[in-house]
């Protein structure tokens, strides 16, 4: 690396095996690949990054004092001597990843392919970090050496079975597919830290000797996350003479992340197309090689990031006096919701694909309307009857509509040289349709915070991405800010009220 102790060693093994049998009726494939990466980045947090501190630290300061100790005269909790950071830290990190992939393809009759696919990816990470007794953050907080270790294991399994058939009868062309998919995800994490070590020689290899452990100040943490997704799907495509096109598909999927009453969702789609360039009435326009009008409608589902939003979540919070001592309470941090279900996006699309002069000029024009319903949001609820003041539920809806245009050209194309030009244009209009329903109420707007200050507002009937704050209109004779109040008059910022805030712009491009 370009910074001391930032060297990285990486090993990339890969094995591929392909075998055919039964006169090529069956094809077997297997692949094993992965990597092992070892590195020792000498910092744990951004403010201990030596490169970050080298940019902020005064370059005229000497690295060390006359007595050989590190010069920390210009240091602060967020500005440290970068050379001292490098020399007084030690890191040892190993990340091992392996991917296993297997596939079997059977062709029992012409046009029919039966596929079985399985993959497993495993990632194991182990990281160790140590700050010596001379490290600024340990001397600043009296820790006399600090060590931490983290480890994690991620395993992602996937299986898919499909049967696909394709054939043609004269000018009629069909292909269809049916299948089943399964995905299982598991993640485990553990960490520990300790400080006040009798010697720096231990580094992170004898975590138990730090006296912070006996004082109850060491930290230990573990977490686990798992989810499963299962789906059945089918698709049918038909075209006549590559002129008229029809397509229909459906997916029936279930996810463990949703409530017990709504784990499954059905997602159909249908589309049609007409390539007018193939019609007889277009023969005189020989420069047009493609002019395809198409339309489609479909529903897709969105899965939340967290695996346990439909369940009661527990957390430590508050203390209770019990049998002569204060006990940290275990309490609900979120209510169970057996009716938590898929977010559903319904989209209609109307488009035109074009190509002129054998696709020397080509592109597309699309118009879409997209409505997302059953948005997942955290709502405030009464306690009792609920055990927690928050519940994750489906209530809101958003509509987006817009136009997308692409224009591509090949002005010059020779044996040895090709010139491609591309131009894209898009516009989108969004509108928040609702935030609440009969059961869960969030009001007509939600304010977004950055560092505890209101910066955005999400309001029913308005577009997404609105900046919300005070509108500055100048400064007074003393250099103070002037703002526009709610009634349109000008007032000093010192007299500003929360009600004077207004929409002052939008973060999203039109």
Task: State what each model feature region is.
Residues 8-14, 231, 265-267:
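Transmembrane beta-barrel architecture of outer membranes
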Residues 3, 12, 16-97, 115-230, ...:
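Surface-exposed loop/interface segments of Gram-negative outer-membrane beta-barrel transport/assembly proteins
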Residues 230-240:
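Structured alpha-helical segments in the cores of large, soluble enzyme domains
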Residues 349-351:
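Glycine-centered tight-turn and secondary-structure capping sites
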Residues 1, 246-255, 411:
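Transmembrane beta-strand segments that form the barrel wall of outer-membrane beta-barrel proteins
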Residues 3-5, 256-261:
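Solvent-exposed loop/turn segments connecting transmembrane beta-strands
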């Amino acid at each position: 690396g370009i910074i001391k102790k930032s060297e990285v060693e990486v090993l990339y093994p890969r094995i591929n095996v392909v075998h055919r049998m039964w006169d090529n009726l069956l094809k077997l494939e297997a692949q094993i690949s992965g990597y092992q990466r070892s590195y020792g980045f000498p910092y744990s947090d951004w403010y201990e990054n030596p490169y970050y501190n080298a940019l902020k630290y005064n370059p005229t300061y000497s690295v060390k004092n006359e007595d050989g100790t590190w010069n920390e005269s210009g240091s602060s909790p967020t500005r440290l001597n970068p050379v001292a950071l490098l020399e007084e830290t030690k890191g040892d990190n190993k990340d091992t990843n392996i991917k296993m992939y297997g596939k079997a393809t059977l062709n029992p009759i012409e046009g029919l392919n039966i596929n079985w696919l399985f993959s497993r990816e495993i990632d194991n990470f182990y990281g160790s970090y140590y700050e010596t007794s001379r490290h600024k953050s340990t001397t600043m907080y009296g820790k006399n050496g600090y060590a931490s270790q983290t480890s994690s294991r991620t395993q992602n399994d996937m299986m898919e079975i499909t049967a696909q058939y394709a054939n043609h009868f004269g000018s009629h062309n069909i292909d269809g597919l049916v299948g089943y998919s399964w995905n299982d995800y598991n993640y485990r994490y553990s960490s520990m830290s300790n400080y006040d070590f009798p010697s720096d020689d231990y580094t992170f290899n004898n975590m138990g000797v730090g006296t912070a452990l006996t004082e109850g100040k060491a930290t230990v943490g573990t977490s686990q996350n798992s989810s499963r997704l299962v789906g059945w799907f089918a698709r049918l495509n038909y075209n006549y003479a590559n002129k008229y096109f029809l397509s229909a598909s459906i997916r029936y999927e279930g996810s463990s992340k949703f409530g017990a009453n709504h784990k499954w969702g059905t997602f159909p789609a249908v589309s049609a197309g007409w390539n007018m360039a193939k019609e007889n009435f277009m023969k005189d326009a020989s420069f047009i090689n493609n002019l395809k009008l198409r339309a489609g409608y479909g529903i897709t589902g969105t899965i939340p990031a967290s695996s346990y939003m439909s369940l009661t979540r527990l957390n430590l919070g508050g203390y209770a006096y019990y049998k002569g001592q204060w006990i940290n309470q275990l309490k609900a941090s979120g209510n169970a919701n057996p009716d938590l279900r898929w977010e559903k996006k319904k989209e209609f699309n109307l488009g035109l694909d074009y190509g002129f002069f054998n696709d020397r000029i080509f592109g597309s024009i699309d118009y879409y309307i997209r409505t997302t319903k059953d948005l997942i949001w955290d709502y405030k609820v009464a306690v009792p009857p609920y055990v927690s003041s928050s519940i994750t539920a489906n209530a809101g809806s958003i509509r987006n509509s817009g136009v997308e245009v692409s224009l591509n050209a090949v002005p010059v194309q020779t044996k040895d040289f090709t010139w491609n030009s591309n131009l894209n244009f898009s516009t989108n209009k969004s509108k928040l349709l609702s935030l609440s329903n009969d059961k869960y109420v969030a009001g007509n707007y939600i304010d977004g915070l950055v560092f505890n200050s209101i910066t955005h507002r999400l309001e029913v009937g308005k577009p997404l991405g609105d900046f919300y704050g005070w509108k500055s209109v100048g400064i007074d004779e003393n250099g103070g800010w002037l703002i526009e109040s709610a009634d349109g008059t000008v007032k000093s910022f010192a007299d500003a009220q929360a009600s004077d805030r207004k929409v002052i712009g939008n973060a999203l491009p039109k």
